[in-house]
């Protein structure tokens, strides 16, 4: 990837949602909700505390994470639809 996030920002690729319901009904693209789960693609170096010391992020590339429905900024990088968000927008890491 030709993009490196700064500070406490991360780049996330959304994981696609289900194509069918449990009952077998196919969900059209227009009715699908945006997935709130994604994979971390790249992370910034971290934020700075009050004394100016660098604080590394708790997440790393490859982590699967949950985030809020309206979190982040949607961007297209190298032909991929991605999100750029602050680490604080991430709700947690999926084990």
Swiss-Prot record:
GO molecular function (one): unfolded protein binding
SUPFAM superfamilies given in the database record: GroES-like
Example of a GO cellular component annotation carried by this entry: cytoplasm
UniProt-listed CDD domains: cpn10
Xref: InterPro entries: Chaperonin_GroES (IPR020818), Chaperonin_GroES_sf (IPR037124), Chaprnonin_Cpn10_CS (IPR018369), GroES-like_sf (IPR011032)
Domain of life: Bacteria
Keyword Cytoplasm on entry: yes
The entry's keywords: Chaperone, Cytoplasm
Keyword Chaperone on entry: yes
GO biological process: chaperone cofactor-dependent protein refolding
Localization: Cytoplasm
Function: Together with the chaperonin GroEL, plays an essential role in assisting protein folding. The GroEL-GroES system forms a nano-cage that allows encapsulation of the non-native substrate proteins and provides a physical environment optimized to promote and accelerate protein folding. GroES binds to the apical surface of the GroEL ring, thereby capping the opening of the GroEL channel.
Protein family: Belongs to the GroES chaperonin family.
UniProt subunit comment: Heptamer of 7 subunits arranged in a ring. Interacts with the chaperonin GroEL.
HAMAP family documented for this protein: CH10
Protein name: Co-chaperonin GroES
Gene name for this UniProt entry: groES
């Amino acid at each position: 990837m030709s993009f490196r996030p700064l500070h406490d920002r991360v780049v996330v690729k959304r994981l696609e949602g289900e194509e069918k319901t449990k009952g077998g009904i196919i969900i059209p693209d227009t009715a699908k909700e945006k997935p709130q789960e994604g994979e971390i693609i790249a992370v910034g170096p971290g934020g700075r505390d009050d004394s100016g010391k660098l604080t590394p992020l708790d997440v790393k590339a490859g982590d699967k994470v949950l985030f809020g429905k309206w979190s982040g900024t949607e961007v297209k990088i190298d032909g991929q639809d991605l999100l750029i968000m602050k680490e604080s927008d991430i709700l947690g890491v999926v084990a």
